[in-house]
A protein has these predicted regions:
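AMP-binding/adenylate-forming catalytic core of the ANL superfamily
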Residues: 1-65, 74-75, 82-92
C-alpha cells in the first residue's frame, strides 16, 4: 500500500485560491481499503467546484493522493486549541 499523509493533501488544498479551510480523512473503500475524503470551506466569494479542485490537486500531487470525495461544509470542527476534530468528521461521514 501507499501511505498518504492527510497533511500533505491539506497543504495542496490550502494553495487553492477558493479554499479558506480544509481537513482530510481516510474513509473505508472496498477496492483500496481506504480512500481520501476532503472537507472544504470555501472563501466567502466562491462556490465549491469539486472537479476543479481535483484538477488543481492533480497538478500538485500524484493522482492517487487526490481526494476521491470532496464535501463542502461551512466550518471545520475544531477544539478550543484549534485542533481539527477528525473524529467528528468521521462521524459525519458515517451518518
Amino acid at each position: 500500500g501507499i501511505n498518504v499523509y492527510p497533511r500533505e493533501v491539506e497543504e495542496v488544498l490550502f494553495k487553492h485560491p477558493n479554499v479558506s479551510d480544509a481537513a482530510v480523512i481516510g474513509i473505508p473503500d472496498e477496492k483500496w481499503g481506504e480512500a481520501i475524503k476532503a472537507y472544504i470551506v470555501t472563501t466567502s466569494s466562491s462556490e465549491g467546484d469539486a472537479e476543479e479542485i481535483r484538477s488543481f490537486c492533480e497538478q500538485e500531487i500524484s493522482k492517487i493522493k487526490v481526494p476521491k470525495i470532496i464535501e463542502f461544509i461551512n466550518e471545520i470542527p475544531r477544539n478550543a486549541g484549534g485542533k481539527v476534530l477528525k473524529t467528528e468528521l468521521r462521524k459525519n461521514h458515517d451518518e
